[in-house]
Structure formats: C-alpha cells, structure tokens
C-alpha cells in the first residue's frame, strides 16, 4: 500500500517538474551518496511502516471477526437463524478462505432446511481443509438422510481413517453396507465393530442378525437375536425374527417358533405375516384347526396380495 510522504518525494518532484538542467546535474552528482545512505534508510523506514500498518490491519480484522463471531453465537442461541446466516456471510466476506466459517454456515443451512446449500458449503469446507472431521460427519449424516448410503459410507470411512479412536463410526460403516443390502460386507463390518465396541455387543448382534436373516443364514441369525433377547424380550419385531428363525432351521423347532410368533402377534408386529408363519408351524405340529384360524385372519386383515394368494391356496388344500 502506498503512503504519501512530503519529504521523500524530493527527487521525484524535481524530475516531474522539469527543473533547470543545472539543478538536475547537481542532484545527479549527489545520487551515489544519497542512494547509499538516505534512500537505504528510507526503504527500511517504509518497510517498517508497512509492516506496522499490516499488523495493525490484521489486528483490526481479527477484532472485527471476533466481534462478529460473538454476535453470530448469540443469534444461534436465540434460534434467529436467518440473522445468523447474514452474520456468517459477513464473516466470509472478511475471510473467504476460512473452512470453519463454511462449516458454520453449512450447519445453519441444515437448521434452515437448505440441505443442498449445506452440502455445497461442506464440499467447500473439505476442499479448504481435507482433514476437518466434523465436516465429514455432517455431510455423511446428510447423505444418509437422503438415502445416499454410498457417499455416506465413503465419508464414514474417511472419518475412521482420520481418527480410529472414534470406534463408534464402525457401526455407521456397517449400517451403510446393510442399507445398500451388501450384507456380507455389513456382517464383516459388524464383526469389526463388535471387537472394538464390546459395550455395544447386544445391539451389534441384533443388527448383524438382521443381515444374516436376510441371507437366510437362520442358524447364525438366531444366535445373534438370542444375544439381544434379554435387552427387550417383549419387542414385537425381535420375537417375529426369532420365531421365523426357529421355523426356518434345517430341523425346524416349531413349538419354539409358535411361542415367539405369538408374542410378536400380541405386540402388534406384522400380525398378518406372523399369523401366516404361525399357521405354517401349526400345520407342522398337526394343529390344523389353529392353522386355519391363523390363515383366515390373514385373509381378513392383510393388504399383501401375494401373501393372501399363498394363504388362500393353503386354505383350499385344508378344505379338501
């Protein structure tokens, strides 16, 4: 930045105003001496003044940003997100290369339900700071909310690489595989999570059991579900899954299946499908009347056309 100095422009004024040639010659004779002394000190002083001015400007900018940040925090605390957005935009006008400001604005955009804008800010944040853990976390959560499990998985994997101490991320990695129906990788990921997070063993077993159930590995699925059973023994879905596993074992345990499916029905979980499965179990235990009652329930209450077709076929056979 240039500064006006009334004294140090002496030679410049002589030249620009085109003084008489005699004066110019006199000055030119003095130049070697002046360049070695006066001009050297002048440059040093100018550099020192510039550094002091720069430091002063930086301090002023820092104070302005700190004040704006305090105001921003107050606005967020008051849930005045629109005004807070104006304030963070002001901060970005002061420092457009600050990844933390983009991250804060992304958080505000989430609160304002502007998901696309939030993702754009998070992308910018991570271009500026590829190691910013919180930005990956928020972007992964937004991806999951939009059922974009592939990108969520990539962000969770990056998070774990950045900070392996945050082992709970392993559960999110496994869940992303599961949501994409990549059950084998999900099972492996849950195994890794279980080793790292023994305090969540039961919850991990339940989730892994669902994956194994989906691959029709009913024996291993049953073992996982039973690990979780004591946590919530009245849960309708859990009882349905356990009952269905017993029913589908190579050597089906139909009495056990009936017991768990009955609990699921009483809990109101998928009563039509649970009744159908229990009806099948009743047939295997020679209780045709009870089976027929369950199948009639399915016909009266189910909205699943394929399930009703299968049920009607069984009822027709029972009537023969």
Question: What name fits each language-model region?
Answer:
Residues 58-100, 104-111, 141, 175:
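Alpha-helical segment of the N-proximal tetratricopeptide repeat
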Residues 104, 138, 172, 207, ...:
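Canonical tetratricopeptide repeat
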Residues 101, 135, 169, 203-204, ...:
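TPR alpha-solenoid repeat register
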Residues 94, 128, 162, 196-197, ...:
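Structural marker of alpha-solenoid helical repeat scaffolds
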Residues 90-91, 124-125, 158-159, 192-194, ...:
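Canonical positions in the second alpha-helix
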Residues 77, 111-112, 145-146, 179-180, ...:
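Register position in tetratricopeptide repeats
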Residues 98, 132, 166, 200-201, ...:
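Residue-level recognition of tetratricopeptide repeat
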